[in-house]
Amino acid sequence: MKLSSNHKNPIPTVDIIIELKGGVVLIKRKNLPEGWALPGGFVDYGETLEYAATREAKEETGLDIELIRQFHTYSDPRRDPRHHTITTVYVAKAQGTAIAGDDAKEAGVFQKEALPDKIAFDHKEILNDYFSRRY
C-alpha cells in the first residue's frame, strides 16, 4: 500500500510509571500543556519502545530505570491536545532521587492519596488504571 504525502499517522510515544520510595515519579512540565505528568515523550526514529522509555526517564528524571513490564497502550485521539499520539505505558522501578531535567520544572514522588490536582494529558486516567490494577 502506497501512502500519499498528505497521509497523517498518529505519533508514537512512551510514558513510564516509575515506582520509587513507595510512590510514583511525576514531573512538572516546563512546556504546554502545563501540569504534572508521567515521564515520557516521543519515540525517535530507529528506537525501540523500551529504549525510548529508558532514555526519556533518564532525560526527565535523572533516574536509571529497570523496566518491569509493558502496562497498557492508550490511543484516544484527544489524549494530547497538540497531536494525535498513541502511547505505550511501561511500569519501571528505580533507586535514587528524581531530579528535574530536560523539559521538567520539578520532579517528585507521589503516593496514590496525594497526587497533584493538575495532571496533564490523560495521565490521571493512566494512574487510576495503575492504582486500581486495571491492566
Language model segments and positions:
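Active-site-adjacent beta-strand/loop module that shapes the phosphate/pyrophosphate-binding cleft
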Residues: 74-98, 130, 134
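NUDIX/MutT-family hydrolases
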Residues: 89-91, 99-132
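A structural signal for short, well-ordered beta-strand segments
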Residues: 16, 70, 90-92
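Acidic, metal-coordinating catalytic segment for phosphate/diphosphate chemistry
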Residues: 1-15, 130
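Conserved hydrophobic "DFG−1" position in protein kinase catalytic cores
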Residues: 18-19, 26, 92, 109
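A short coil-to-beta-strand element that immediately follows conserved catalytic motifs
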Residues: 63-72
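Conserved Nudix-box catalytic region and its N-terminal flanking loop in Nudix hydrolases
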Residues: 20-59
